[in-house]
Amino acid sequence: TRLRTVTGVQTCALPILHEIDSDRLTREIQLNVGALTRLSHAAIRAMVPRGRGYLLNVSSVASFQASPRLAVYSATKAYVTSLTEALHEEMRGTGVRVTALCPGLVRTEFQSISSTEQYSRDFPSFSWLDVTDVARAGLRDMARGKVLSVPGALYKGLFAVSDLLPRALVRRISSLATGRH
């Protein structure tokens, strides 16, 4: 099912939580939360004694709001962003820089792996970021000591506005974008 929003942008209809295999959900949580936490821990333990290092954790703009039909994904990415912000503060003064890279839609193999390839065409071309540009932005922002890196003018704007809007309104907008209406 597809939905047209007021702006005329077609949006996709992703599965809701109870329609997703529980093993798939567990793997997503293990990867986005468990593995990232263990790798961050190991990296920081090696960097702190040296008094220098860089840690760039890949999160998502989905981490900034609840995303119906992407509930587990946005929740795990919220964890990544929150953990990274906390580590950024913990590492202050140690020479270790910690940044969360929070891109929006990026054209990669993720679409085929996540079975969302068919939804790619549902989003306007201007909403897609180039993977090389995203990587460069993340590395640049990390080198500058920024805690959050949000590549792309569209997503920077959405990020700025999302903090100003009531959470209920942001959830509703997210619902429209993911096909839950």
Model-derived segments and their meaning:
Residues 67-71:
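Active-site loop immediately N-terminal to the catalytic Tyr-X3-Lys motif
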Residues 16-19, 23-30:
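Active-site Tyr-X3-Lys motif and surrounding loop/helix of classical short-chain dehydrogenase/reductase
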Residues 90-153:
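SDR active-site lid
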Residues 1-12:
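Single conserved hydrophobic/aromatic residue that forms the stacking wall/gate
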